[in-house]
Amino acid sequence: MDVTAKYELIGLMAYPIRHSLSPEMQNKALEKAGLPYTYMAFEVDNTTFASAIEGLKALKMRGTGVSMPNKQLACEYVDELTPAAKLVGAINTIVNDDGYLRGYNTDGTGHIRAIKESGFDIRGKTMVLLGAGGAATAIGAQAAIEGIKEIKLFNRKDDFFEKAVAFAKRVNENTDCVVTVTDLADQHAFTEALASADILTNGTKVGMKPLENESLIGDVSLLRPELLVTECVYNPHMTKLLQQAQQAGCKTIDGYGMLLWQGAEQFELWTGKAFPLDYVKQVMGFTA
């Protein structure tokens, strides 16, 4: 790829960031499509996010991806949010139109698209959702929009717990889905929820390096063959949760599916062009 002065910059702002496959995936897609953009990752956390956004405007970047820990904070720095992003309370994509910043969340649409592509219909189903960060709430919001019946969200009593309660209130008021929020330490409630669930989704960083030997499922007998287990973590590709699920006979969807489909939507928002899906799946080794 020969980068010229006509190229525009697209970023990814997160911390940590060096594990991300997004720069490789997006740059392969941009090169294949012959588009004058380059995509770069920047280590940005909550303490430097405001100045990074000022830099984005000053450099006239086309936009940026946003990942942990900035997804919720980023909502405060854009001029406009999509209805879905408002429901989530977090964004993973910013598009810069001559200094006017629009915030989107493609995490939810990407993850639900991966589920649908597997042939699973979420309508009328019940999901146990682990986590209450930007990715988890995006998945929950999109699932609610697309007709899931009930979401049982479990999260530790940390800084995200009250945000999870507020998220549940927004979804309950604006969709037909019923969302409950429970402390993950309540193992009795967790066991009961899994017993009646159709889908278990990990929206936390548990399983991601350096937590690759950890899983929020302590008792593998809670996993039933009829349960669909989905993962947001893609590094490592086969998380401990997915290993447990496969051993229990569950159908699984790995984190590559969400990465691929959310990235495809981001690409189209930034460039206005179709994402070269089949090519990217091939060169990245994705099976989604």
Swiss-Prot record:
Keywords assigned by UniProt, alphabetized: Amino-acid biosynthesis, Aromatic amino acid biosynthesis, NAD, NADP, Oxidoreductase
Stored InterPro entries: Aminoacid_DH-like_N_sf, NAD(P)-bd_dom_sf, Quinate/Shikimate_DH, SDH_C, Shikimate_DH-bd_N, Shikimate_DH_fam
Transmembrane segments: none
GO molecular function, one term: quinate 3-dehydrogenase (NADP+) activity
NCBIfam families found in the cross-reference section: PRK12749.1 (NF009390)
Catalytic reaction equation(s): L-quinate + NAD(+) = 3-dehydroquinate + NADH + H(+); L-quinate + NADP(+) = 3-dehydroquinate + NADPH + H(+); shikimate + NADP(+) = 3-dehydroshikimate + NADPH + H(+); shikimate + NAD(+) = 3-dehydroshikimate + NADH + H(+)
Subunit text: Homodimer.
UniProt binding sites for substrate: 71, 107
Residues involved in NAD(+) binding: 132-135, 155-158, 205, 232-235, 255
Gene: ydiB
Protein name (database record): Quinate/shikimate dehydrogenase
Main enzyme class: oxidoreductase
One BP term from GO: aromatic amino acid family biosynthetic process
Its job: The actual biological function of YdiB remains unclear, nor is it known whether 3-dehydroshikimate or quinate represents the natural substrate. Catalyzes the reversible NAD-dependent reduction of both 3-dehydroshikimate (DHSA) and 3-dehydroquinate to yield shikimate (SA) and quinate, respectively. It can use both NAD or NADP for catalysis, however it has higher catalytic efficiency with NAD.
Domain of life where this protein originates: Bacteria
Pfam families (UniProt xref): SDH_C, Shikimate_dh_N
EC id: 1.1.1.282
